[in-house]
């Protein structure tokens, strides 16, 4: 929906924020993607959603190559935000000692959005402001293309 605007605004960057949890996803079951779920496997589903984010960034990079649009997927880190508000006391204080601040968590996103170094590359996965190797399944070009086609079909209706 925004591709024409991004192309007209080039150079432009698209920063997608999945997380390391995508490494846990083994693939995408397209038969259940549009079904409503109340499953207890929320972490598994979250991993699949984050895998889809990485695949999207990679497929978008392929589709816009040479247009002045660059794409990035990244792991922001485990950040001490309100997302952890449901963790019971005293565990909340304990785990927050091992988390990074919101400012630290923004570093990789800002790096991908603004740095000259990142601007020269597209379709990469970043962690701690450096390109990293994403999961093997997230590098499956056929799966990325299938997800793109399915997503377009769902949006069109």
Where are these regions (language model features)?
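Generic structural signal for alpha-helix termini and adjacent loop/cap motifs
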Residues: 1, 115-118, 157
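Hydrophobic core positions within the conserved protein kinase catalytic domain
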Residues: 2-3, 109
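Catalytic loop of short-chain dehydrogenase/reductase
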Residues: 3, 7-69, 75-96
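Non-catalytic terminal and boundary segments that flank Rossmann-like NAD(P)-dependent oxidoreductase
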Residues: 11, 23, 27, 137, ...
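C-terminal helical subdomain
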Residues: 17, 49, 73, 96-134, ...
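Residues that form generic nucleotide/phosphate-binding pockets
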Residues: 33, 97, 150, 154
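Short C-terminal domain-edge/linker segments immediately following a structured domain
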Residues: 43-51, 62, 102-106, 141-142, ...
